[in-house]
Amino acid sequence: SRAAEAVLFLIEVYCIMDGFFVVVACISLLCAITAVLRVRAIGWAVWLWFFVGWITGELAIWCIGLQVVFVAAWVLIAGTDTAGFSWGLSFFLATWVLLAVFLRDALDAGATFSRSLRMALGVGFLEEISLLRRAKITNQLHSKEWQWPFRFRRPGVRYVRNLPYTESGKRGLLDVYVPVAAGERRPVLLQVHGGAWMVGHKSQQAQPLLHRMVESGWVGVSINYRLAPRSAFPAQMVDVKKAITWVKDNIAEYGGDPNFIVVTGGSAGGHLSLLAGLTPNHADWQTGFEHSDTGVQGVLALYPVVDLTNRHGIRQQDSMDSFIAQRIIQQSREEAPAIYEDGSPISWIHRPGVAEVAPPMFIVQGTHDSLVWVEEVRRFVADLSPIAAAPLVYAELPRAQHAFESFHSPRTNHYLNAAGCWLEWVWARHQRGEQK
């Protein structure tokens, strides 16, 4: 009887292992589906869809590699003579096909960026950059970065941490990223983190971009700012204005040019960056420092929120109205219409003089962004581009999810190359005196 019990036990273990293989394969396939399929209006579940699709897609090479190792190890240990293995292998093969489609689009991002830059700036825009600075630009893909997607530090960068720019405790601090090589009057890149205006930290986002640009000779600044719901909007925008003022007053000590600042950010940070570019010296957001110049020389906005009011009805069933009213502005549109309007970048486009003084902009948006809908960003670009005095570059990336460039991946690599080209072009334009 003991022998029979042992046989039954082995059969149970075998069945469990067989089922485990199928379950892992099913989960892998579901994750791949979230990466390639655009799903948005599903309530709060959209956050889970975004997160799984984002991680799976941008780490697709790692996912495929680990799954291949898993299948190979299973074959060596458990064999292939089961129905469960056949089903599981079918699911894995489907997963790899979907991730291969995703990778194809990610690897094509370089061509998308190139077309967007040339359409907006001209075919020969790189020739406007000095030979010395052009040598810093690359269009190569660096596979070494994909091997370590979360390794950001570079030997040519030193850090000055936790400098206060306003009296808001830890939320009023910023970090300065400085090239190790000595220099002065370097271009400045000011990073504003995202996080739905409620979460986020100066050390968490845009690390690939900051390190790439600082290593090539820029000075980077990354800020904290007050968060909702403790601080209602527009406190976040006021802090961005204060940070710009701090940079203009202090960045020369770190080798930066106080007269040249490009502000960048993604999501809520992209929203604040666009507002910074469209509202220089807006008195309502500069109480106590009304006479400070808060103009910037460029805006690099990724998947930015462009409308707090859903004025065009694009979102339909997935309106942000309740979230904005309860958590961010903490007043309804009826109670505070001016705050909603002023807080919507799209509302500034047709105000007198705004399009004429807006700096060059580079807006990047993914078609499969679950949190910021591509149709809203398209509408913003379509409204501003024809009337803007300065060039507006818009790159729309197939299958790209929210926060796609947060760590190293093939698509992030293409983005860094394109951002470097554009930033150097804006800097060259400024040096020629073509913008204030």
Where are these regions (language model features)?
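Short, Lys/Arg-enriched N-terminal segments with co-localized hydrophobic residues
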Residues: 1-16
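Alpha/beta-hydrolase superfamily serine-hydrolase fold, recognizing
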Residues: 14-436
